UniProtKB/Swiss-Prot annotation:
Belongs to the UPF0235 family. It comes from the Bacteria. This is UPF0235 protein Noc_3000. One of its GO terms (cellular component) is cytoplasm. InterPro entries: DUF167, YggU-like_sf.
């Protein structure tokens, strides 16, 4: 069974991230084991990398910044992030299954 670096909770996307700060550019590298590897330019100092990551994810998933939350990993490279109702999905992410009510 394939290890998944994301899951859905209703319409919210939960992503397990492996962050590489102080990179040359901001980019999503792709799956890295059970995490999604992301590189950002911000340094891991005084929360700058976390703030930059959340802004980058908001832009990538086409949501407002207040729809992106850091759930865990404030001082670690391994993070869990929640994105509320993402408008755009990355390749490899399947949309949530919507249950119909009869």
């Amino acid at each position: 069974m394939a290890v998944r670096w994301y899951c859905w909770q209703q319409e919210a996307l939960i992503i397990q991230i492996r962050l590489q700060p102080r990179a040359k550019g901001d980019e999503v590298i792709g799956p890295h084991g059970d995490r999604l590897k992301i590189r950002i330019t911000a340094p891991p100092v005084e929360g700058k990398a976390n703030t930059h990551l959340l802004r980058f994810l908001a832009k990538t998933f086409q949501v407002s910044r207040n729809q992106v939350y850091l759930l865990s990993g404030a001082t670690s490279r391994d993070k869990r992030v929640r994105i509320e109702k993402p408008t755009k999905l990355l390749p490899g992410i399947t949309p949530p299954i919507r249950k119909t009510v009869r």
